[in-house]
Amino acid sequence: MRRREPGRDVKRAAEEEFIELERRTDTYEDAVLNEDPQMKGFRFPSILSFPVPNKTIETGVTDENPFSARKSAFFTNRLIGREESDSSSSREDSPLGSTETGESCSTTDDEESKEKRIEYRDSQTQRCLGFCFRQLFFSRMWVFILQFIASYYAGDRFRTDGFNLVDKLIEPGQSVFGDVVVRRGLMGLRRWDAQQFLFIAEHHYIFEHSLAFFAGFPETVNYVRVGVNNGMESVFGWTFPPWVTITLAAVFVNLFCFLLCGMTLYQVVLIMTRSVKISLLAVSIFAFNPASIFFSSAYSESMFFTMTLTGFVFMLFGLRGKGFWHRMLKGFTGTICFGLTFAVRSNGLLNFLYVAWIWCGTLLWDEEMPIPDCHKLISTLAATKNERYKQEWQAKFWRFQQKRKQNRKVFRWTDPNFSRCVTLFIVIVCAISATLLFFTPYVFMTNFTADEFCKPQDSHKQAVETIAKTVRLSPKTVSVKNAWEKTTWCKKPKLFGIIARYYGEIQTKYWSVKFFGYWKIKKIPCFLMMLPAAILTVLAIKSSWNDVFLNKRWNNIWVLTARSDHSLPMAIHSSVLLFVAIFYINSEVFTRIIFSSSPFIYIYIATYIDKLTQGTIAGNRLWQYFESPGILPFFVFRRVWQDGWRGKLLYIYILGYFVFGTMAHSAWLPFT
């Protein structure tokens, strides 16, 4: 039976169905590509408007196989016996074959090839984490060596009038192990603010100035110390003096947090950049960063950055998750992690920006309903004998199928499939819940420390008397014995009836923290010390701004909250930190704050190095990372050094601060 040629009405109906379905696949990114190129850049009227179309492409957390040599020359296998070329043929002729490159020779995705790809991906991921671990571990060994050399030869030659009560209370001869390891080997890790944290961990908050240092880190160190002491007493019947176990506990906690932090940084950067190379470079830069000494000293930077990155991992996976309850679980877990940062450092308050930003993307965007297939067009193409018509529409149909398979999200507020009342209710409930989860650790911490100081136990008063017998205290010292007589904030009512108000008053009283309070002639060297970090931050902010508004042209705040492949919220966060560092707080602390607050600087530097090391240049092959022993920083490439003054200054800054900053801090010189 001969097939009848479809009539014009049938073809028109099929074409109308196709056009309607194709329109439903349009996304905001497609509309941006069709805009006038002259319209690029930041435009305030459109930044807050609802996106049109109200869909965005869901790129997924990572590729199914991020180690495929067909996607990037970076994954080309090492060629033995002949010179490597950067052509596609060299990548496809890799001796590893399809199994090792994760690509199946067959077009069918059978279970066996899928299992091989998963196995290969997991093995490569483990090797990447192994590279990260080597870089992180050996960088700590260098820090320990440098701090020992500096503290041993400098001794107390450069000791200032800063707080050093922990060292004064040490009684030499109590422990040979303590004298050798702690007083000699690790003395460089007990300088400057480390004295404050170690004192709090041992004696709690018995002096007023100690309340400027949040309890998250010293309380953790104290718990570890108590556990070690109890364990040693139960097993051996004896233990080390408190000053020995507290120092060892602080070093152990920071070493553990630093290693975990580097591994988590790899995952966060991979989610944001979809680049294994940039992720590995970011970890290598982090391992030898200019503020590296503060991640090993008895400071709270390592713990703070670990919790921050953990919050990023959970919330970004929640943003990219499938299913409502899965997204809620990840989002609330990430919120708790970000909230804990506020109990560790005061700048954890700014992490609420990330919580609000990512929750907007999680709640206001949802998975798109499946788009049906073009059944009328399929039947029409099967029946038509017009080859020209068939070829034309088959090409359109193929492009439609490619777009139809994309994962997309829709903006719930303007999509007719979602109720605005339900969306508003969910947003309000989650906003209240997330706010409570974020601020609860801080409220608990402030009330705990304030009550410990203003309503002291007899043991704390006794500790002050014991210290006063050993060390002469200044008459201006405010302790738990005279808290009510010499302080005003102890008598003030709590903010909202639940938050103790003391932090700002103590910072102003002891460190002159106020607007323009640090702008003095004698503080110019401190501003010069922060200058390289400030310049890097400004360049990173500019790069992020241009990437979003000039290159990608995503001039819509709602679309930006739905996507994780940009760093605009980190740029805003870093802008606030830079402003506060210049006009408000002690400027010299900006270096360690910016390098321990977000992955922003690491992503910027790693991206810069990535662009310079393309082709067959050293550093653009994954096997080179795997074969690196890790004892030296891997991100140092000749090509970057040859990039004029920028590359040279970058390396001089990072490695100079890593070496000389570590030694200066350990010798009591003003690198704080």
UniProtKB/Swiss-Prot annotation:
Task: Please indicate the ranges of residues that lie on the Extracellular side.
Answer: 156-239, 320-345, 445-520, 591-592, 670-672
**Topology Cytoplasmic: residue spans:** 1-134, 261-277, 367-423, 542-569, 614-648
Q: How does it sit in the membrane?
A: Multi-pass membrane protein
Subcellular location as annotated: Endoplasmic reticulum membrane
UniProt record, GO biological process: GPI anchor biosynthetic process
Tissue specificity is: Expressed in epithelial tissues including the epidermis, pharynx, intestine, rectum and excretory cell during embryogenesis.
Please state what the protein is called: GPI mannosyltransferase pigv-1
Q: Which organism is it from?
A: Caenorhabditis elegans
